[in-house]
């Protein structure tokens, strides 16, 4: 398994991560600068490229250890998710998403094409499960809203292709959002990200 965390390795199937992975190895012991230094506290010890390294908890727990390394089903998630089930039943279809997919099922079942998103769909559920068409939002580009629709709880988000046609919410767009040249340092409001860019509204 390559740093993309999908069965096809780091090829085009992963959104062409390659160097975008920041040089994190398949074991992701040292994620590299692209990961923000989450290190061992990350629930997904494989790098999921979107196209940068993202150390995203597959479930809602802060670390694999706290999820219960004794859970016994780490292997089924490629060693990335100690206790998905204990984190809200988001164990869904880890294997089918190349091991990096903690919560396919937690997206309400509409997340059927994890593979089409490069298999690096770290935390579908964290976007509220409303992410039906991840491909149309360029989900492989997002390291924030997983797969890429911006929602109130996504935190720092909105890579260059994240919010089209999605809209950012007030808490999503720090430090940048939507298109590469817009809304810095402003946050997008609900109407600003369609269809191309967002104007700063304060």
Curated annotation (Swiss-Prot):
Keywords: Keratin, Repeat. Residues 48-195 are annotated as: 7 X 4 AA repeats of C-C-X-P. The keyword Protein transport does not apply. One of its GO terms (cellular component) is intermediate filament. Sequence repeats lie at residues 48-51, 54-57, 144-147, 162-165, 172-175, 182-185, 192-195. The keyword Repeat applies. Expressed in hair root but not in skin. Expressed also in brain and skeletal muscle. In the hair cortex, hair keratin intermediate filaments are embedded in an interfilamentous matrix, consisting of hair keratin-associated protein (KRTAP), which are essential for the formation of a rigid and resistant hair shaft through their extensive disulfide bond cross-linking with abundant cysteine residues of hair keratins. The matrix proteins include the high-sulfur and high-glycine-tyrosine keratins. Interacts with hair keratins. This is Keratin-associated protein 5-10. It comes from Homo sapiens (Human). The gene is KRTAP5-10.
